[in-house]
Every structure is written in structure tokens, then in C-alpha cells.
A protein has these predicted regions:
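Short C-terminal domain-edge/linker segments immediately following a structured domain
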Residues: 34-38, 63-64, 95-97
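Hydrophobic, Leu/Ile/Phe/Ala-enriched alpha-helical segments that form helix-helix packing faces
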Residues: 19-26, 51, 98-105
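A short, hydrophobic beta-strand/beta-hairpin element that forms part of a small beta-sheet core
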Residues: 52-82
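Ser/Thr/Gly-rich flexible loops in soluble cytosolic domains mediating phosphotransfer, phosphorylation
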Residues: 73-105
Length: 105
């Protein structure tokens, strides 16, 4: 399966995600960036937009996406991400939650 970390251009988190989160993601996690309505990814935008359209919490970024057995599974990490960011907490909880999601086959 494929693993994706999706984030958007929200000003109060974009730099933190790009400078702190993305460099520490597992090597098997690919990035999808939403710059407004434009999808920036190594995959064709049409393919990604179909997957994003099916997200349960589409506006709750950052978001995790996994493709398992041709099924799209997703989870928002918005709450834990912003709690950590706003309260300057260690990132362990966020990475543990993300790794648990990606490990779930």
C-alpha cells in the first residue's frame, strides 16, 4: 500500500510542517500539498483529487491517507497536531499516532 501525508497552505502551520514534520516522516510516506485548490504531488492531480474528495474530514488538515487493497483509508491528525503546535509539546504523540495509522494494514 501507499502512505500519504496531506497538508495545506494554512499560514500558521505550513512552515512548521515543512521544516519539522516532513523531514522526520518515514521514508515510505509521500507528500500531498494543497496550495489553495491546486494539488502538488508526484501523482496526477486527477488521481489525488478523487482520493481527497473521499476524505471524511476534508477540511481538517494535516491529514493521513493510506491505500490498502485498493481502498482509501484516512485519518485527520488536526487535533493532536494543533494541540502540540499551540502548546509547544513534544512531537512524540503526533508521530506515534501517524506511525500507528500507517502500520495498520
Amino acid at each position: 500500500g501507499k502512505n500519504f501525508f496531506c497538508y495545506n497552505n494554512r499560514l500558521n502551520s505550513k512552515d512548521f510542517i515543512e521544516e519539522v514534520i516532513i523531514p522526520n516522516l518515514r521514508s515510505d510516506v509521500e507528500i500531498i500539498y494543497l496550495d489553495g485548490k491546486e494539488i502538488v504531488s508526484d501523482y496526477p492531480p486527477k488521481y489525488i483529487s478523487v482520493a481527497l474528495y473521499r476524505l471524511h474530514n476534508y477540511h481538517k488538515f494535516p491529514h493521513l491517507l493510506a491505500i490498502r487493497n485498493d481502498q482509501v483509508v484516512d485519518m485527520s491528525v488536526n487535533n493532536v497536531f494543533y494541540t502540540i503546535l499551540d502548546q509547544n509539546q513534544p512531537l512524540d504523540r503526533l508521530f506515534n499516532q501517524m506511525n500507528s495509522f500507517f502500520n495498520n494494514k
